[in-house]
Amino acid sequence: MASASYHISNLLEKMTSSGKDFRFMATNDLMTELQKDSIKLDDDSERKVVKMILKLQEDKNGEVQNLAVKCLGPLVSKVKEYQVETIVDTLCTNMLSDKEQLRDISSIGLKTVIGELPPASSGSALAANVCKKITGRLTSAIAKQEDVSVQLEALDIMADMLSRQGGLLVNFHPSILTCLLPQLTSPRLAVRKRTIIALGHLVMSCGNIVFVGLIEHLLSELSKNDSMSTTRTYIQCIAAISRQAGHRIGEYLEKIIPLVVKFCNVDDDELREYCIQAFESFVRRCPKEVYPHVSTIINICLKYLTYDPNYNYDDEDEDENAMDADGGDDDDQGSDDEYSDDGDMSWKVRRAAAKCLDAVVSTRHEMLPEFYKTVSPALISRFKEREENVKADVFHAYLSLLKQTRPVQSWLCDPDAMEQGETPLTMLQSQVPNIVKALHKQMKEKSVKTRQCCFNMLTELVNVLPGALTQHIPVLVPGIIFSLNDESSSSNLKIDALSCLYVILCNHSPQVFHPHVQALVPPVVACVGDPFYKITSEALLVTQQLVKVIRPLDQPSSFDATPYIKDVFTCTIKRLKAADIDQDVKERAISCMGQIICNLGDNLGSDLPNTLQIFLERLKNEITRLTTVKALTLIAGSPLKIDLRPVLGEGVPILASFLRKNQRALKLGTLSALDILIKNYSDSLTAAMIDAVLDELPPLISESDMHVSQMAISFLTTLAKVYPSSLSKISGSILNELIGLVRSPLLQGGALSAMLDFFQALVVTGTNNLGYMDLLRMLTGPVYSQSTALTHKQSYYSIAKCVAALTRACPKEGPAVVGQFIQDVKNSRSTDSIRLLALLSLGEVGHHIDLSGQLELKSVILEAFSSPSEEVKSAASYALGSISVGNLPEYLPFVLQEITSQPKRQYLLLHSLKEIISSASVVGLKPYVENIWALLLKHCECAEEGTRNVVAECLGKLTLIDPETLLPRLKGYLISGSSYARSSVVTAVKFTISDHPQPIDPLLKNCIGDFLKTLEDPDLNVRRVALVTFNSAAHNKPSLIRDLLDTVLPHLYNETKVRKELIREVEMGPFKHTVDDGLDIRKAAFECMYTLLDSCLDRLDIFEFLNHVEDGLKDHYDIKMLTFLMLVRLSTLCPSAVLQRLDRLVEPLRATCTTKVKANSVKQEFEKQDELKRSAMRAVAALLTIPEAEKSPLMSEFQSQISSNPELAAIFESIQKDSSSTNLESMDTS
């Protein structure tokens, strides 16, 4: 430390040197010292350093001065508080100096100090004291109005300080406001402008009294309207406040908007611009409060969008009618540009109107149909706007409209799910001709910006409405070619033109382009040869799509591709051979050439083997291998049967080696390639090649990656069918892995289906030691030997399915095996595991093979219903149902008879019936529907809820068989006097809803409202199941309930409230325990709310929704967890609405995070509280992603509370790490 002090005193001495270079070097060295973490200054050194740095602010040399100012940053954090106050005092005094240079350098110094202070959320006393010291000096400097340059600097620093440390200055806010308000009438516009910026930062952190004072002042001054100049300033100020604190100004809009509307009618273009900008900020920042005024705002914007008093557009309109595909004469281009009037401000009004319409369109999704009636035609008519900047904003507004129209989810464009009448998509479709007509002329404008806007517009239009331009291609192609050929086109314009062409090619049928191929190929080929890699890359993508157009393989085509093959091939091969090109170009050249060979390979002659050799080289390169594998897969699957023999000998072993690489996408791609090669080129593959692949397979068959396993099993199935002799090699490790996977509880879905296909293909190959009985023993052996216990029930189901698959493939073996399984069930010495497997296997076999010849089967299964093991009973129930499907006339009457005569076994028998209804064919079941229906209705009033649920599921699935007859019958039971019956039929409806179109859907849509009326049922349980059914509809088929939301939501929200009358105390020994009978129904209501965010967001009043979310944040553990999830979703979906409610949301979150569990609580309580804290923190992290959320005083206070609490800080940090790693994963496209 002594040496550091000595070194610094040495530097201080040099700073007094008369040589400016010495002073400069010494100051620079001091800067370096101050930036070291290790430096510690004693009191004396601190005083001397501070004094010297302040003295150097007045140095004669500018460079020394600047360095001295930079030293202030690190110095502030290295010296004691009173020294920082000395620095600030001196800088404030110097800021008022007569010397301009000293004033300037002191202002920079103050900004540097403020920038270095710890943030308000850290709770630092230093920051608070320094800011208080500066504030007093600044307010007096601003209020004096003596020297404008001092005022401007002071306002600048004030704004900076309020934005960084506003929360610390709450006590000064009234005096800051008092000094700022008079500056709004300053004769200098620059002063007014900076005052508005400072006020914008003030409103983010000031208390309500100050905020109300400011708004009242602005409203009263606007009402007086003393001078046009100040009125303009006040309107700008209101817009700035709205932008910074929209959530606070909302309640004053009823007073503000009529004034702003009035000023729009004043003949002053600047004022009009500011008024419309204010509307834009209200629309974006106060969505709820502005709602009643949106129509007025739209009308004003539409009026001023065309406001161009000094220019006549009439001649152009006539021009527009003469639209032709050749584009006419280009000599008249740019005539608009010749018109100029420097005093004309009307373009600013038009631009403000376009931006405001953009804001309205982007934020009011529910008004889309209205926008297509009024806003869309108006914007289209303004594509001809003469002022380029305004035109760009008009285009941007229309792009926003298209983006809002893009179907977000499949149900929006699913014809079954469409609401009746005109939809935004059909309205847009009808306006496409007008859009194309308006764009046609713009596409040959000189302006690059305008043409880029046209391409963006066409791209978005085709993404929203694929096929929309089918009739208009002849008109648009010349415009695209114009930009591709234009020497003056910028690179970005060419890229946009190519990208637009690509999207159009992808979304229209090939025939549409055939008349234009001759015109399109040359410019695209020229772009492939462009020296700029981004243009080449985009052009290769277009070329690949053009290849599919000139020779489509999936439909008959009479188009002659021959004239274009040479050009397309030559330009692509040149790029394919080049070694030093960009990675993107390399990959796209490979993909494009793959497409050329796939579609045109029979025309390439001697070029084909040479090109395939290049592919072989690319296969050996780590960077290009995955793209090459995909290209080879495409070629191998071509119906042209391309000759791949020249490369298979070397290529297949390379592909085999990829299966051991630690790159998942490469493994999956390689398995696809090998599969198609085996299917289409089996005669060209040798046993050695196949063995090389088989050697690599065992590690791929594993439960750790089911998708890779599925692909590997599918490959083996193909091999068994095409190359059965190779399977003798799999009896070792591959088969062990397969059998191991069958026992995995994770084997289901696609992987299980692949496994069943494989066993069926394998058993018929007749391979040694892999016959029916061999495989059966391998599959079932462990269960019989009891050597390895199968812990998971799913494993027994998988083995049973495999046994059934083998038996279906070898039906002659069936009777003996079925007989054996029946004996296993009967045998008193059989373990439960053996019985379980035998019953499930009987069920799976009987599902596909009629077992009615097995006379004792019924009695054996019924006997198993009495087993002490629940799993065996359940398996017997499943087996009976599944066997019945194999022969309905034999077994179904028997099951119905048993349900009637065996009340004790009813529950299990109903499960058998459910299996029959779920799995049997509609035709087979039709004759029995009436009998089953009558039986089920007898049991729908059963007091046992489990039985009622099975009955309801049976009723629902039965209704799907004959909806016209049965749905009205279900509806009739809604008026039953039994609440059990009502709950059964409402639950039954849940089982008629699925996520794909069904014949019942239109009928269901007409009557689901009647079922949902049970949300008003007096019985709590009926209301709960109504919510569960509603949730299922909202999740799987939102179109059923979208139009009912206005009626349903009040009842839904009603069920989110805690009901005191449903809370009771239960005595358990010496303890009293509180039971809340309303918890389940509240949970169901909140689950519905969560679902609606995904499926019906545009139909929700988000502020009403948030009211109930707020209540949920204070509810029971389960409900808090749900509402925390909702906050995370809402932060992304409607950030501006959440921002308005932020202060009300923070408190319950803080309460959750700071709750302490009693020391004597059980471990489960601690775990629950920990999970609650983590979920609450996730919600906080999501809220903080909303722009400007951290500016809320309550939120920043909560943040500082989190950072000062080690436990909370650790949780918060880990959550932020998790979310950032998740984002990275989602960006990883491999």
Curated annotation (Swiss-Prot):
<feature type="repeat" description="HEAT 23">
    <location>
        <begin position="961"/>
        <end position="998"/>
    </location>
</feature>
<dbReference type="Pfam" id="PF13513">
    <property type="entry name" value="HEAT_EZ"/>
</dbReference>
<keyword id="KW-0833">Ubl conjugation pathway</keyword>
<dbReference type="Pfam" id="PF08623">
    <property type="entry name" value="TIP120"/>
</dbReference>
<feature type="repeat" description="HEAT 25">
    <location>
        <begin position="1043"/>
        <end position="1097"/>
    </location>
</feature>
<feature type="repeat" description="HEAT 20">
    <location>
        <begin position="852"/>
        <end position="889"/>
    </location>
</feature>
<dbReference type="GO" id="GO:0031461">
    <property type="term" value="C:cullin-RING ubiquitin ligase complex"/>
</dbReference>
<keyword id="KW-0963">Cytoplasm</keyword>
<dbReference type="InterPro" id="IPR016024">
    <property type="entry name" value="ARM-type_fold"/>
</dbReference>
<comment type="function">
    <text>Key assembly factor of SCF (SKP1-CUL1-F-box protein) E3 ubiquitin ligase complexes that promotes the exchange of the substrate-recognition F-box subunit in SCF complexes, thereby playing a key role in the cellular repertoire of SCF complexes. Acts as a F-box protein exchange factor. The exchange activity of CAND1 is coupled with cycles of neddylation conjugation: in the deneddylated state, cullin-binding CAND1 binds CUL1-RBX1, increasing dissociation of the SCF complex and promoting exchange of the F-box protein. Probably plays a similar role in other cullin-RING E3 ubiquitin ligase complexes.</text>
</comment>
<keyword id="KW-0007">Acetylation</keyword>
<feature type="repeat" description="HEAT 15">
    <location>
        <begin position="646"/>
        <end position="683"/>
    </location>
</feature>
<feature type="repeat" description="HEAT 18">
    <location>
        <begin position="770"/>
        <end position="808"/>
    </location>
</feature>
<feature type="repeat" description="HEAT 5">
    <location>
        <begin position="171"/>
        <end position="208"/>
    </location>
</feature>
<feature type="repeat" description="HEAT 19">
    <location>
        <begin position="809"/>
        <end position="845"/>
    </location>
</feature>
<feature type="repeat" description="HEAT 11">
    <location>
        <begin position="471"/>
        <end position="510"/>
    </location>
</feature>
<dbReference type="GO" id="GO:0010265">
    <property type="term" value="P:SCF complex assembly"/>
</dbReference>
<feature type="repeat" description="HEAT 3">
    <location>
        <begin position="83"/>
        <end position="119"/>
    </location>
</feature>
<dbReference type="GO" id="GO:0005737">
    <property type="term" value="C:cytoplasm"/>
</dbReference>
<feature type="repeat" description="HEAT 17">
    <location>
        <begin position="729"/>
        <end position="768"/>
    </location>
</feature>
<feature type="repeat" description="HEAT 8">
    <location>
        <begin position="289"/>
        <end position="366"/>
    </location>
</feature>
<keyword id="KW-0597">Phosphoprotein</keyword>
<feature type="repeat" description="HEAT 14">
    <location>
        <begin position="606"/>
        <end position="643"/>
    </location>
</feature>
<feature type="repeat" description="HEAT 2">
    <location>
        <begin position="44"/>
        <end position="81"/>
    </location>
</feature>
<dbReference type="InterPro" id="IPR013932">
    <property type="entry name" value="TATA-bd_TIP120"/>
</dbReference>
<feature type="repeat" description="HEAT 4">
    <location>
        <begin position="131"/>
        <end position="165"/>
    </location>
</feature>
<keyword id="KW-0677">Repeat</keyword>
<feature type="modified residue" description="N6-acetyllysine">
    <location>
        <position position="55"/>
    </location>
</feature>
<feature type="repeat" description="HEAT 24">
    <location>
        <begin position="1002"/>
        <end position="1039"/>
    </location>
</feature>
<feature type="modified residue" description="N-acetylalanine">
    <location>
        <position position="2"/>
    </location>
</feature>
<protein>
    <recommendedName>
        <fullName>Cullin-associated NEDD8-dissociated protein 1</fullName>
    </recommendedName>
</protein>
<keyword id="KW-0539">Nucleus</keyword>
<feature type="repeat" description="HEAT 22">
    <location>
        <begin position="928"/>
        <end position="960"/>
    </location>
</feature>
<dbReference type="GO" id="GO:0005634">
    <property type="term" value="C:nucleus"/>
</dbReference>
<dbReference type="GO" id="GO:0016567">
    <property type="term" value="P:protein ubiquitination"/>
</dbReference>
<dbReference type="InterPro" id="IPR011989">
    <property type="entry name" value="ARM-like"/>
</dbReference>
<feature type="repeat" description="HEAT 26">
    <location>
        <begin position="1099"/>
        <end position="1133"/>
    </location>
</feature>
<comment type="subunit">
    <text>Interacts with TBP. Part of a complex that contains CUL1 and RBX1. Interacts with unneddylated cullins: interacts with CUL1, CUL2, CUL3, CUL4A, CUL4B and CUL5. Does not bind neddylated CUL1. Interaction with cullins is abolished in presence of COMMD1, which antagonizes with CAND1 for interacting with cullins. Interacts with ERCC6. Interacts with DCUN1D1, DCUN1D2, DCUN1D3, DCUN1D4 and DCUN1D5; these interactions are bridged by cullins and strongly inhibits the neddylation of cullins.</text>
</comment>
<feature type="modified residue" description="Phosphoserine">
    <location>
        <position position="558"/>
    </location>
</feature>
<feature type="repeat" description="HEAT 10">
    <location>
        <begin position="424"/>
        <end position="467"/>
    </location>
</feature>
<feature type="repeat" description="HEAT 16">
    <location>
        <begin position="688"/>
        <end position="725"/>
    </location>
</feature>
<dbReference type="InterPro" id="IPR039852">
    <property type="entry name" value="CAND1/CAND2"/>
</dbReference>
